[in-house]
A protein has these predicted regions:
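P-loop (Walker A) phosphate-binding loop of NTP-binding proteins
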Residues: 58
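Conserved lysine of the Walker
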Residues: 63
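Short hydrophobic/aromatic beta-strand immediately N-terminal to the Walker A/P-loop
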Residues: 52-54
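ATP-dependent NMP and nucleoside kinases share a basic, alpha-helical "lid"
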Residues: 136-185
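Hydrophobic positions on the alpha1 helix immediately C-terminal to the Walker A/P-loop
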Residues: 66
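Small-molecule kinase domains that catalyze NTP-dependent phosphoryl transfer to phosphate-bearing small molecules
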Residues: 1, 7-9, 158, 163, ...
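Conserved nucleotide-sensing/catalytic segment adjacent to the nucleotide-binding pocket
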Residues: 77-80, 86-142, 148
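Charged, amphipathic alpha-helical linker segments immediately N-terminal to NTP-binding catalytic cores
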Residues: 1-33
């Protein structure tokens, strides 16, 4: 307009369509569908029920970033599957050659799945945190179960994990961008990702149709 002010819709247009706009952060925009699904889940749940949401996907695809974003908005309890890294005593050739077994799912079920089966809003779940550097559980973490429990990380959709899921999210990434991110943040373990962890993840995705 000549005065430099903001252009407005005409009265006729506003009356007919009632337009409304929101400005959101660019980090949130790619996940609007996720927020909509979670909001719908929360709106339709029983007052005494705690929904479980999982985020699985390729390494480097942004699982932890999305989990942090969801926590900042909902203040939900977050459990990381990295805290259930497989201890050395269980890393047998047979187990590691079986898709989806590269996680201590037995401990996950004992500490998380069983508690989640009876949890109510406001309850807390306490579990041990595995330290990969020390090769053992060195600390514990307590997470809230309100308004929902979020399970973040590779293998969170594994059928060996018996927790009841209400919403499952899968994140993907191009091979080129995946390698770039790994080289940037895990340079010292780049070879392990290429030769071990990525192939194991891909076998797991294919074996159980996780992307579906």
């Amino acid at each position: 307009s000549e005065g430099g002010g903001m252009t407005r819709h005409s009265l006729e247009y506003s009356t007919a369509y009632a337009p409304a706009y929101r400005v959101i952060h660019e980090n949130i925009a790619p996940f609007l569908g996720v927020f909509a699904a979670i909001d719908t889940l929360l709106a339709n749940k029983n007052d005494n029920y705690v929904p479980v949401v999982t985020i699985d996907g390729r390494c480097g695809s942004g699982k932890s970033t999305l989990a942090d974003l969801l926590f900042s908005v909902y203040r939900c309890g977050v459990v990381h599957t990295d805290d259930f890294f497989l201890p050395t005593s269980l890393r047998t050739k047979e187990r590691l050659s079986t898709p989806g077994k590269n996680i201590h799912y037995e401990r996950f079920n004992s500490e998380i799945s069983e508690s989640a089966a009876t949890m109510r809003p406001g309850d807390t779940i306490k579990y041990g945190v595995f330290d990969c550097q020390c090769g053992t559980i060195t600390s514990s973490r307590e997470v809230a179960t309100k308004p929902f429990l979020l399970i973040e990380g590779s293998y969170s959709s594994s059928p060996d994990i018996t927790i009841k899921r209400d919403l499952s999210i899968f994140l993907t990434i191009s091979n080129e961008e995946q390698l770039r991110r790994i080289a940037e943040r895990n340079k010292d373990k780049y070879a392990d990702f290429i030769n071990k962890w990525i192939p194991m993840e891909e076998e797991y995705f294919q074996e159980y149709n996780i992307k579906e």
